[in-house]
Amino acid sequence: MIEEEKIDENELEEDKFIQKIEKLNDFQDEHKYLFRVCLLGDAGVGKTSLLTRFCDNYFFENYNNTIGIDFRVATLKYDNIISKIHIWDTAGQERFRSLSLNYINNSHGFIFIYDITSSLSFEKVEKWISLALQKNNHTVANFLVGNKSDLEQERKVSKSKAEDFAKKNKLFFLEASAKNHINVEKLFYYFLYKMVEFYKTNEYIEDANMKLTTEKTEEIPTERESEKSCFC
């Protein structure tokens, strides 16, 4: 099991690493690393909204709930290293839970998402964490994200409460708004940053559940006939 590092409370506030990251055309095939991250949370918290904002720079007021698994690819360059990220958007409904488990097993990191206007969605995060880490406790970077920060007047979950929860569970924390495009890039860029920095110094980790996926060994989910790429 990879030991979680101590979280620097100010680290997410430092944007220096973001300035070093470039989003590339996703037809760019050559890459050194391929990382997988799974979006987890109840239906309606905005998982698809965050993903669509990041990949397409677009926001829909009304989304249909994800059925099964959606899948996008982002190609990013950091520190002169080109990486691809497979981003798996999982359905939040109970009936799709078993399908989500297949992708949880192969993730390098998790992004647990709740709606700041819904206390219930925040309470359910603990169950998502338990489910995910029970199946895969070899992840490198896990996040807690309070989505819909644009709805401050409807807030039900205080930022301090979420911060305390994140510290307790060794999660990186931020609030975001897919609608107002706040902290969306920072979230996915920070995931990439943590992954690249980790593997630059741990190239030879031998762990059956955390094998580094490199160029020419991409694994495409069988549920989808073709991948969708991220464009901006």
Predicted segments with their positions:
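Switch I (effector-binding) loop of TRAFAC-class P-loop GTPase G-domains
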Residues: C55-I82
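Conserved P-loop small GTPase signature centered on TRAFAC-class small GTPases
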Residues: M1-G44, T48, Y78-I82, H138-C232
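Amphipathic helical hotspot of TIR/SEFIR-family domains
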Residues: S119-N137, Y190
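Switch II (G3) loop of P-loop NTPases
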Residues: S83-S98
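Conserved Walker B
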Residues: A91, I116-T117, S149
